[in-house]
């Protein structure tokens, strides 16, 4: 999940990743859409970051792949090797596990999707940073599309708008493209335990907020252990103002 701010005065686009394990209002933030829909998801994110959200776009991972293929692929630079022994890949009948060495890579849609989705190679924060890196590659590629590439541009925009959940029309998307294509991208920003978050175990029972208890003998409390079933993230000392302040600081830089 990425909060994006466009500053027309500084001509800068700031990307800030919100971790999916952030625990807010009794549930993880990534569960809100499935339960309540996009409007409630937007409302929760507004409350978390302390910023008004004017537009939203929900992109299916396979649409993400198709858009990159329509653009002819994207270029990214990995700062470190990406190794995920749990991520199985198969290409032209040859199967292996995910591995990309550090350096420059030209990625088609499938490769970009693999790099964006890999969860067991590094931390979830590194995954968020890689997703932003791919978005930067998409922006760089899009900057080279102009009036002469009108057919390709319209194909990309139509695929994006028709295959996603968004309140942005094709006409608006086209205006945004030409208005913002040369803005600087401020990426690599992730709300994390490196700044304002703590890792907090919470019970799975959303209704009672009681830990799960397992007893060898229910009549003997000393045989009981409490198990926290979900690892979550919350602001330090449960101070949600820290997240809002962190976001505002990034936007003010």
Segments the model singles out, each with a brief description of its role:
Residues 1-253:
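Non-catalytic, solvent-exposed segments at the cell envelope interface
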């Amino acid at each position: 999940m990425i909060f994006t701010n466009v500053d027309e005065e500084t001509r800068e686009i700031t990307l800030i990743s919100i971790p999916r394990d952030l625990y807010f209002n009794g549930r993880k933030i990534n569960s809100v859409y499935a339960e309540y829909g996009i409007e409630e998801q937007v409302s929760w994110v507004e409350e978390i970051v302390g910023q008004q959200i004017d537009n939203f776009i929900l992109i299916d991972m396979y649409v993400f792949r198709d858009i990159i293929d329509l653009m002819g692929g994207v270029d990214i630079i990995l700062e470190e090797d990406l190794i995920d022994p749990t991520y199985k890949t198969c290409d032209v009948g040859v199967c292996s596990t995910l591995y990309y060495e550090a350096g420059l890579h030209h990625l088609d849609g499938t490769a970009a999707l693999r790099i964006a989705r890999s969860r067991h190679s590094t931390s979830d924060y590194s995954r968020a940073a890689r997703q932003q890196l791919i978005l930067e590659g998409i922006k760089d590629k899009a900057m080279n599309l102009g009036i002469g590439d009108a057919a390709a541009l319209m194909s990309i925009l139509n695929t994006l708008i028709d295959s996603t959940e968004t309140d942005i029309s094709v006409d608006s998307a086209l205006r945004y493209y030409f208005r913002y294509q040369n803005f600087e991208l401020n990426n690599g920003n992730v709300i994390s335990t490196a700044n304002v978050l703590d890792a907090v175990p919470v019970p799975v029972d959303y209704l009672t907020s009681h830990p799960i208890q397992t007893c060898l003998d229910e009549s003997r409390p000393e045989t009981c252990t409490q198990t926290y079933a979900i690892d979550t993230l919350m602001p330090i000392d449960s101070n949600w103002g820290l997240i809002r302040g962190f976001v505002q600081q990034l936007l003010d830089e």
